[in-house]
């Protein structure tokens, strides 16, 4: 199972080329471990599963059913910093990250030069640069704070010195292995929110930024109305094609020292079904697939281009086309983002509270802590499936679950034709009652996955 359809287009053909004699089926999933919990409830946990948004706390219910990589050679191919947050309470490594993507500030160097603004090399200089642009009527930073991932990023990036401190690492290790609730170090998190609030002020973010989505933020930057945006290398490449300007990358700066860091998101996190260990041939194939994915070519395809931070000792980091981060990369000053599922909603509520003026730093911290440990309400079943259909490919009808869903959509729309990409469908249909959220998991969530209906 691959967490998004882009991987079906990029890495799947390469894997099939490497193993032409192996019958390997790939299915698009969703970026949520709940999908795999749903499969496990019906004894259909896939052999290989992947997600991007992940924390050990999100996969607690899957822990008894996942293989421990620690006893296999593949772990020795990873830098120690890359797996430090991947050990569970039993000291097992059930998940592995596959290549990192730098998510840092993208700066319009041409605009910096035009206004005589120095490219910042520490936090103090970043603050000065923001003030100079603000004084000249240019928005310093058009971050898309209407999106949950950017709110998640801004807390960790603003206080990156705290998250990389001994206290921060200790908290992160505990948060990644928490069973019932995530415990918070009040002293640490009050500092984190103090620095988050300061970063928002220093960057001249305000209430209006709550409504800036990714398209608006990009447009402001592309039109020269803001001096900085943020994103991964592919975003920078796309912007460079649109803009008649020189773009460079700026790392995130610690507010407590002169250190700077690359904020990094794993392209995906991967786990194996424990049952693979009962079938040596299947396990060897799965390990071969993993080796293929962490190879140099595999990482390029997964990361979709240049700007790949290799997490493996035998594969070089591919950052030749991503200037501005050389020192941080050479020093391994790389921070792997915390991406527990609940942290995105929690960050959005807290940061929006600060921006709107409705919360002070303490209230924002209390809100984040509350949302992180909020228990999900028990969901009632909304539909009862009378029949069962598999998502697996068969020789007769293709994918029965996909056919059933698409036929239902066609009939509900009184249409003669319904058309969708094969990777639109993610899950089998299981007989019996099902909740609305589980029904929602049966189709992919990628924005470029279109569905068409037509009356003929």
Where are these regions (language model features)?
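Glycine-centered hinge/linker elements that transmit conformational signals in sensory
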Residues: 132, 174-210
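Short, solvent-exposed loop/beta-turn-alpha elements that line the ligand-binding surface or hinge
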Residues: 68-80, 84, 162-191, 241-242, ...
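Conserved N-terminal structural module of periplasmic/extracytoplasmic solute-binding proteins
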Residues: 1-56, 119, 362-363, 370-411
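Extracytoplasmic/periplasmic substrate-recognition and gating elements
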Residues: 17-18, 114-115, 240-304
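Extracytoplasmic/periplasmic solute-binding protein
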Residues: 94, 127-180
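A structural signal for short loop-to-beta-strand junctions that line the ligand-binding cleft
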Residues: 37-40, 46-47, 75-111, 139-140, ...
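Conserved C-terminal helix/tail region of periplasmic/extracytoplasmic solute-binding proteins
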Residues: 113, 299, 313, 327-421, ...
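Hinge/lid segment of periplasmic solute-binding proteins
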Residues: 52-104, 118, 127, 154-156, ...
């Amino acid at each position: 199972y691959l967490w998004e359809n882009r991987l079906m287009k990029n890495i799947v053909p390469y894997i099939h080329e490497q193993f032409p004699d192996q019958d390997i089926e790939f299915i698009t999933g969703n970026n949520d471990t709940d999908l795999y919990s749903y499969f496990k409830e019906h004894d259909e946990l896939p052999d290989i599963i992947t997600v991007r948004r992940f924390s050990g706390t999100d996969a607690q219910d899957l822990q008894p059913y996942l293989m421990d990589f620690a006893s296999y050679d593949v772990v020795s191919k990873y830098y120690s910093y890359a797996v430090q947050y991947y050990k569970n309470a039993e000291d097992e490594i059930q998940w592995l990250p596959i290549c990192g993507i730098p998510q840092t500030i993208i700066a319009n160097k041409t605009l910096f030069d035009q206004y005589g603004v120095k490219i910042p090399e520490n936090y103090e200089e970043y603050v000065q640069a923001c003030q100079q642009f603000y004084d000249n009527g240019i928005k310093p930073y058009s971050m898309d704070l209407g999106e949950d991932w950017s709110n998640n990023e801004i807390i960790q990036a603003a206080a990156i010195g705290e998250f990389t401190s001994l206290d921060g690492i200790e908290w992160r290790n505990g948060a990644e292995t928490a069973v019932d609730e995530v415990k918070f170090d009040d002293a640490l998190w009050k500092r984190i929110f103090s620095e988050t609030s300061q970063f928002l002020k220093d960057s001249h973010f305000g209430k209006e930024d709550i409504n800036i989505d990714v398209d608006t933020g990009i447009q402001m930057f592309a039109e020269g109305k803001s001096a900085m945006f943020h994103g991964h290398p592919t975003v920078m490449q796309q912007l460079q094609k649109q803009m008649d300007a020189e773009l460079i990358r700026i790392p995130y700066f610690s507010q407590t020292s002169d250190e700077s860091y690359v904020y990094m998101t794993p392209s995906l996190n991967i786990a194996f079904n424990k049952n693979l260990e009962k079938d040596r041939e299947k396990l060897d194939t799965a390990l071969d697939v993993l080796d293929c994915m962490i190879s140099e070519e595999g990482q390029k395809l997964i990361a979709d281009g240049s700007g790949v931070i290799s997490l493996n000792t035998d594969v070089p980091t591919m950052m030749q086309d991503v200037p501005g981060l050389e020192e941080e990369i050479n020093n391994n000053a790389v921070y792997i983002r915390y991406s527990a599922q609940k942290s995105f909603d929690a960050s959005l509520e807290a940061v929006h509270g600060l921006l709107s003026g409705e919360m002070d730093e303490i209230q924002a911290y209390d809100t984040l802590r509350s949302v992180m440990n909020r228990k999900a309400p028990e969901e009632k079943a909304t539909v009862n499936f009378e029949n069962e259909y598999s998502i697996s490919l068969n020789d007769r009808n293709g994918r029965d679950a996909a056919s059933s869903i698409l036929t239902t959509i066609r009939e509900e729309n009184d249409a003669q034709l319904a058309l969708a990409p094969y990777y639109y469908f993610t899950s089998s249909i299981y007989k019996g009652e099902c909740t609305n959220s589980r029904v929602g998991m049966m189709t992919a969530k990628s924005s470029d996955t279109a569905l068409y209906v037509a009356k003929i």
